[in-house]
């Protein structure tokens, strides 16, 4: 079917200049450029890839599911089938069965007759006629038409005819009949084998006379090899199908290799010659370009290596055949053939087995510089995709794990027994030290990078094991320089602070080896970087006293496979003792003691002093900074002078000749002192509106202004240094846990709490006990009860309160009302769960703190899909029920009410478990005590509501810094990470408000007389790139957590997950935030993980996100009234969770292309200046007046036009409502908009407050003027305070030499004379006395009240689709990328890397080279037109060309005899460009430009 579809695509070429869209049958581009026979297509078995997945996993079981699961599914299928039967269908079914019986009987009779005729026929023409008829009958027969007797009788006859020497047609038809017989009646294979069919077919392949006969032999052998691989092997089928493989087409070559794959599954090491002789041919085939062919060859070689792994002689023979040389080419990232992940991992595993058993392979890998290839793999592979946190047993099938196993195999341990192979390997490395040094130079840096990146415990253990072996083997000083350059001491210090004993033991072993071999180099470094401190901490804590190795075994899933302990996960084979941990009980304590006593004795290290000179100096500066807190807060000058002096000394140390280590930076206390000084200690307190702490906020703003000036005085260098130090400190100190869930089998459970209902996942067993001393509550009489793990503690409160309360509820209503008010206003972007009856594992798409803090969340869990907004209309009585009245404790510690029961228990358990924990121990039973809540619930009220602090110019920055402050539970028992997080958040805020803070500093300097010229107020800032605030370690942890689908779907996520994303989203990469956003906003309907897909046969060992099954709705749009169509679409589907596909009136075709173009057209329609939505910027429209362009353009992007409160703007507001809905729906469906919004408008979307300085992003010239006027007002005010009004009158307050009164400014908004600046009228003139009111009026009209209604309208429209609060985790640039895709289109490197050439074209075809040159010559507008022509949108999604799905494909277009007269055509749903083979580049450019300009605006079928 694929080729027929392809044929149709190439022949039917109507309207060539028009874009093509898919009809109801989606177009799927072929991966092959050659046309093959129907039989060849039939023999490309779909099961090959499945086999590849299974076979490349060294620990995979044959079945992807357990027997019980299969039986349950079979029972379900039987039940479903039975439910479909009815009396009405029985007669039709009987008729069908009668027809099938009659047909089978007729076919059987025909076959019998043909068999008799063939047996007695000797005339070649008669035999040919009978065979033709036999093939026709067999091709339409069913299995019921044949029997074993018939197959047994047919087999010898067909085999005899297949050996016919004189007639090629008889041979061909006989072999074709054999092929059909295997297809129709698989049991016939046994009879065919019995009658020597395989030798006959092999003979025809070894002496090829007729190509079509040979091809048919390959088809037949492929069928037979599926059921009788051993017989094929013994008959020499491997060499038969491979001997002349070069003579066949690609499709037939695939059939031949499929035969070899089937045979290799049943290889036996007892008879090596049949498959060993084939290795040279297979190695040659690895050089071919066809991916499917090369993958199957790689699978064959992997199987052969498996069988030969026990024989060093056979492994050596494989190496001599060139297996290693050809295999390593496949690992090259620039290889012509890209292998699938399972096969790629299998090749790496094959190399490991070769190296393990063959000294020749070991030497060859080193001589080929395998370290470079492995380094490239490790450095480009996403560490977050490393060993699956849910399936550690399947880690061997993971790419990073396989690489590490090969690395460890290439570093042999010193032979302690009579092991000749190990001795040969070691002597080779001793005699070739340069090879080992090169291997170390390649691998050490990347392994240390992996250790620093937050890799899980399995990968960390592998890296450390390899480093330990490398340090033991190395005999030269090169390794010392490498370790010093990669700061190994700091890495070890961080590793030793972890909780897993396996990792700690290896880290201590590495430290011991380094001290033994290179004591002089590393002794001081270990002290400076904190290794000695970490060792002492181990000795003084319980981590060093007991072995917690068993903690890792708790991570194993329920499986029939043998699970290795972590310390054996990189060993070569499973053993009967693989579950026994090798670590002795006190191994950590013994090792740590030995290192301390052997290398850090009293004569070497004074433990009482315990400080380096650098650390002591920094400690003194930290104390001085803390003492500065005692100076009165309003003493600005004194504060500035002392802070300048202290900070300059700190920076001198950080930039000094002797570097400051991460350990010294942390231990000095500088971070805590700086955080306390800048925030005046508020960052550690709970703030409340109107509290005494708020009085100090203006002074705090001043401190941050001064600190900004200090950090950015010499560009971004100083700030970057501080950020890097803080990032290193955070990576070293943070121990945020990763929750490893095992995929518990879904089962029906009953949750008594909160509302007694069935769940499809396990419940928690909890016993609620009244707290000791609690007298106002009664005992809860029941024993253990089942609790829904997804409900919030407030729901448990709501359930228990009536059962344990003694006094009437009215007595507590008064104190509850305050909480009601606070709870109703809270917003959040955290991921919460909603277990709807239809899909209990989904993630709630309407997430807010209100829903989290209210027990009504549980009621919402069973609501119908159409009632998702019902919670917004809950009654006041329901709110009262949600007020927290009980306080819950587990083992004496209070549980956090903002979490689910599962999360609250999880948070408690994580404090005492290893760094990567498992949820199997969380099901219970648990004893939770309850008592009356004595205080109001924690509230994150807005300390900066609109209208507050009107005279405080620092309000936007302080609002950003303190409104969404760090959750106090992040503080925990460890202060340094909390201090670091606050400083990083502060620096990111300063970086984000850099123009604001620097402008304020300049205005104050002008006011104080430190600046004399208004031109000196001009600010040019260089912010630090956002990427510097991203913590790679936390991002990798977040990625790993998001990949754990069960934890995500059940809210089994550690609390830091939501806390950090809510308060410090800058710490995470844009890609990680995007995944979080989609889960939080849209839930598992958009990205759904299926636990049942993670069986042992999944060689990735990881959860595969698959597209959710959201329903699709088609919408008919009208191009002439595009906004009206958009309004109708949003009215119908805006608040529904459906994917919309657009088709146009009087046009055929629907799908991705028309839908993307629809959003592009709507985007342009919203830019119509006649709508009155946006500010005008006529100067930017080059060569076209606004009224003729139809699209408003602005140098700063689109920003709402100000409208006064008295203006009639209902139409404009409706347009903004529609715009908000369209934007939200585009985000929900993953569509790209072509809407150039200004940065300031994005800030409004994100809920940020704008100030006068944000006008810089709307109208830079207006902002410049306002800043200068503000500086004059500031100078006047300060002189008046110092010298009185008479003194102020004497100072120079002119505007560039002109008095304010002489400027003749009216009280009207510049550019909008109809907008009066209250309380004055347009007739009033501006003077020095009312200048401040004039400035406030302009700012208010431009970015505050003048646009407030428009912004509220936009947000209300957006909230109809999903909560706009979910966007708050992004910054303005990221939000623009989310909405509008990439700003840059594409470069030539991207074009070469991410465009596919097929169906007649390759990357070296002349027409393709013409096209690449033309694209390179295109200007930006032509590139946009080309993209819209091919994809439907002029913008690329985030990630550029690489993110296009399907991939942009260029194929040859077959049209008329003269290609130069044809136009290119496209299929936008597949991003498919059909390009005629033009005779010249000039002709192609002419036709392409004509097509992309004139071919827009309509869709027709190809």
Swiss-Prot record:
Biased composition (Polar residues): 22-46, 849-875
Gene3D superfamilies on file: Hect, E3 ligase catalytic domain, Hect, E3 ligase catalytic domains, Leucine-rich Repeat Variant
UniProt xrefs under SMART domains: HECTc (SM00119)
Keyword Repeat: yes
PROSITE patterns with a match to the protein in the record: HECT (PS50237)
InterPro entries: ARM-like, ARM-type_fold, HECT_dom, Hect_E3_ubiquitin_ligase, HECTD1/TRIP12-like
Compositionally biased region (Basic and acidic residues): 1-21, 91-107
ARM-type repeats, residues: 143-183, 186-226, 228-265, 267-306
UniProt keyword annotations, A-Z: Repeat, Transferase, Ubl conjugation pathway
Annotated stretches, region: K-box: 1022-1096
Region of interest called Disordered, as start-end residue ranges on this chain: 1-107, 833-881
Cited function: Probable E3 ubiquitin-protein ligase which mediates ubiquitination and subsequent proteasomal degradation of target proteins.
The protein, known as: E3 ubiquitin-protein ligase UPL4
Gene: UPL4
